[in-house]
Each structure stands twice: as C-alpha cells, then as structure tokens.
C-alpha cells in the first residue's frame, strides 16, 4: 500500500469517527467521505488482473430497468407489509453481507501483521449433511471477520449511524474494487441510463425518497447534522459506487498505458465537482436531489473534454479490460512456450 493510499484510508477512518467528538459540517462530511471512499476503492481495484466482475453493454442497458423493478418492489413491500417485518428480514440479509464486506475491506491491512501461513494455507469446511457444499477460507479471513461480526451485531441491535456508515463504506469500497465496466463505452451507457433513472424516480415519483427513508439498512450513509428536526443528511451508496467504478476504470486505463493518473484525475475531479453541485442545489432548494443528475455529466464531461483536448478519443474508446486480459494471457503462453523450446 502506497503512502497516499494509506493516508486516504486513515483520513476516511478519522472522518467517520470525527462526528462522535466534534461537530462536523454535514455538507463537507458528505463530499469528503464520498470522495475518499471512491479514492480508496479505485486504488484497491488496480491489480495484476482486472476486477472479478465485468459488466457487458447488454447488462448496462438493462441495469436501470432492473433497478427500477427492485425499487418499485421495495416501495410496494413497505406499503403493503409491516415496515418492521421487512426491515427485520433485510437486517438479517445485510448482517451476512456486512461481515463479508468488512472482512474483505480490512483483510489487506490485517494480513501484514499475521504469520504467512495464516494468509496462504486454506481451510476447507464441508457441510455435515451436504458434503458437496464447502467453504474455503484462511485464518487471516477469520481474524478479519471478527470486527465485521461485532459491527453487524451493533448495527442490528442499535442501528447506530456509525455502524451503518462503517458497513456502508465497506460496501462502497468492495463494489468499486470488485466491479468492472470493462470499457468506457459500457460505462457511458450505464451512467447515461442511471442519469435518467435517478431523475425520474426522484423528481416525478415519491418512490425513491420514500424507500430511502423507510429502508432501515446500510444502503445509505448517514451524516449527523445536529438538528433535531432533521438529524441526518443522507447519501445513497449508488451515488458513490456507480460513478466510482467509472473513475476506477479511468485509473486502470492510465496504469495500462504507463501514464500517471491523467484520466483518473479528470474523472475524480468531475465526481467531486458533481457531488459538490448536488449539495449546493439541495441546500438552495431545500429538497432531495438526484445526485447522478449532477455527478454523471461531471464525470463523463471531464473525461470527454480531457481526451478531446489530448486527441486520444480513439484509444480511450477502444480500451477493453477483457481484451487486455486475453492479450496478457496469450503473451504469457507464448513466453512459456519459448522458454520450453530453449530448455
């Protein structure tokens, strides 16, 4: 982990804890926390191989429709079923997800302090009655899951804003780290679709705001305001993860070309500007705003202007992580065959 990455992790942890001891401006807290989560997730996504999950253009086109169906389903569940019952089921679901997400987030930091065999030697556990079902894990993962277990217990019991945010930030970092858009074309399709999705569900229906207020699970970050009438400002995790995976793609594009953070800086600046404009407009009108309405033009616009200015539209549009992975695999096979012939 590089110095700037370590500094970002420490800053994110400190900012999360700060409202416990001092009054933090909620607007500044929203912007700084979201930007730090994106920054950390982006750098964690830079690995020898591309992220495990890559989105296709077809998936990107369908995503707003699937998201709309899920959002409407949740709205109807809260409307026709007991709110407490729905949230109890969701809490149990997110309890398991929270342990896994926080474990994966903490693991790289914890591994450095544990014996090598704890990191390398896997333990296989098989279900007593169903031997075909097995789980593989290391001792390091067990150690890393302990904080996640206690945070999930705390969240389930108290629904404290800090426990909510720790789990929510973990989901954001893991989402940005593990998901890949594959190409900038796919990213543009996804962000454009969600741009209209966010506008429709926030401005033209009460569904988005109603679900956000009723959904008592770590799908949003909460920022204390000190105002009894409105105790928390909120930011949905989707407003961090969705643009975040586009910013992460820009960073990996820079790394693949051996250049230092040129397009990453543009995308990250676009995200910061877009989120800042969201907060300004929200406070001006004193009403909920679809964050992607401002973030999407910021992220795509800054990257587009940058590549047009540099005359690099073609390499940016042709970049595809899955093809890059295949080319690397072919090169490795060729090298291994040549080495065998020499032997």
UniProtKB/Swiss-Prot annotation:
Its taxonomic placement starts with: Eukaryota, Viridiplantae, Streptophyta, Embryophyta, Tracheophyta
- Which positions does the motif PAL occupy? 290-292
UniProt-annotated stretches for the region Disordered: 324-343
Species of the source: Oryza sativa subsp. japonica (Rice)
The protein's matches in InterPro entries, at most eight in alphabetical order, are given as: Peptidase_A22B_SPP (IPR007369), Preselin/SPP (IPR006639)
List where in the cell it is found: Endoplasmic reticulum membrane
Q: Tissue specificity, please? A: Ubiquitous.
TM region(s), chain numbering: 20-40, 63-83, 90-110, 142-162, 166-186, 189-209, 231-251, 267-287, 291-311
Protein name in UniProt: Signal peptide peptidase 2
- Lumenal-side stretches of the chain, per the record, are 1-19, 84-89, 163-165, 210-230, 288-290
Q: Which residues lie on this side of the membrane: Cytoplasmic?
A: 41-62, 111-141, 187-188, 252-266, 312-343
């Amino acid at each position: 982990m590089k110095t700037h990455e370590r500094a970002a992790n420490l800053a994110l942890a400190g900012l999360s804890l700060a409202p416990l001891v001092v009054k933090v401006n909620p607007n500044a807290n929203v912007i700084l926390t979201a930007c730090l989560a994106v920054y950390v997730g982006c750098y964690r996504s830079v690995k020898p191989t591309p992220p495990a999950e890559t989105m296709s253009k077809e998936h990107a086109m369908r995503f707003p429709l699937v998201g709309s169906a899920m959002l409407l389903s949740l709205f109807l569940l809260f409307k026709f079923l007991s709110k407490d019952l729905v949230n109890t089921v969701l809490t149990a679901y997110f309890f398991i997800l929270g342990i896994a997400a926080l474990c994966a987030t903490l693991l790289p930091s914890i591994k450095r302090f544990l014996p090598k065999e704890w990191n390398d030697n896997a333990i296989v556990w098989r279900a007593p009655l169903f031997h075909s079902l097995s789980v593989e894990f290391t001792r390091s993962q067990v150690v890393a899951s302990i904080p996640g277990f206690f945070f999930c217990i705390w969240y389930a019991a108290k629904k404290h804003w800090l426990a909510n945010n720790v789990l929510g930030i973990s989901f954001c970092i893991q989402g940005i780290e593990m998901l890949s858009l594959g190409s900038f074309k796919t990213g543009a399709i996804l962000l454009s679709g969600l741009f209209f999705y966010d506008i429709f569900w926030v401005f033209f229906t009460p569904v988005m705001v109603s679900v956000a207020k009723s959904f008592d699970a770590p799908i949003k970050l909460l920022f204390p305001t000190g105002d009894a009438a409105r105790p928390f400002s909120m930011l949905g995790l989707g407003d961090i993860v969705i643009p975040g995976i586009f910013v992460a793609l820009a960073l990996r594009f820079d790394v693949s070309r051996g250049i230092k953070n040129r397009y990453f800086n543009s995308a990250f600046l676009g995200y910061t500007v877009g989120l800042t404009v969201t907060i300004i407009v929200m406070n001006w009108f004193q009403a909920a705003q679809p964050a992607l309405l401002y973030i999407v033009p910021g992220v795509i616009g800054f990257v587009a202007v940058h590549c047009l200015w540099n005359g690099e539209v073609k390499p940016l549009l042709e970049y595809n992580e899955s093809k890059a992975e295949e080319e690397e695999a072919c090169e490795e096979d060729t090298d291994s065959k040549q080495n065998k012939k020499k032997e």
